[in-house]
């Protein structure tokens, strides 16, 4: 227990010291190059602060949700071989149903329509 306390204290002190040194020694001198927008090495064609369509944001969020669904359902074939496969199938069905209902809701609200 004494060794554990020593190791935890040492790691905390080392982390605090490195964080403090980084805060004090950091060179925060913004200039025009650091504050200018960067577009693949070229000067920007227009203002980089223009708002973009919220539909792109919604499509990106939907993509992330369905990508997460795939990541959650990927181990499903191995999980079915466990002692209680019905519990696994119940959770998988629940995940798919929730995402399907969310997609239907988004579709009926017009979130996926591009033309107005």
Swiss-Prot record:
Cystine pairings recorded for this chain: none
EC category name: translocase
Any one GO cellular component localisation term in the record: respiratory chain complex I
Entry membrane topology: Multi-pass membrane protein
The enzyme's E.C. designation: 7.1.1.2
Catalytic activity field: a ubiquinone + NADH + 5 H(+)(in) = a ubiquinol + NAD(+) + 4 H(+)(out)
One Pfam family in the UniProt entry: Oxidored_q4
GO function term, MF aspect, one: NADH dehydrogenase (ubiquinone) activity
GO term, biological process aspect, one: mitochondrial electron transport, NADH to ubiquinone
Compartment annotation: Mitochondrion inner membrane
Role description: Core subunit of the mitochondrial membrane respiratory chain NADH dehydrogenase (Complex I) which catalyzes electron transfer from NADH through the respiratory chain, using ubiquinone as an electron acceptor. Essential for the catalytic activity of complex I.
Quaternary state and interactors: Core subunit of respiratory chain NADH dehydrogenase (Complex I) which is composed of 45 different subunits.
The protein, known as: NADH-ubiquinone oxidoreductase chain 3
Gene source species: Gallus gallus (Chicken)
């Amino acid at each position: 227990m004494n060794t554990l306390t020593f190791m935890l204290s040492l790691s905390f002190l080392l982390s605090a010291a490195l964080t403090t040194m980084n805060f004090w020694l950091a060179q925060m001198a913004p200039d025009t190059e650091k504050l200018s927008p960067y577009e693949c090495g070229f000067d920007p064609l227009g203002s980089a602060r223009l708002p973009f369509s919220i539909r792109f944001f919604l499509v990106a969020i939907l993509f992330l949700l369905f990508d997460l669904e795939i990541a959650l359902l990927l181990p499903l074939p191995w999980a079915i071989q466990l002692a209680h496969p019905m519990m696994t199938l119940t959770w998988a069905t629940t995940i798919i149903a929730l995402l399907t209902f969310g997609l239907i809701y988004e579709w009926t609200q017009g979130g996926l329509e591009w033309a107005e």
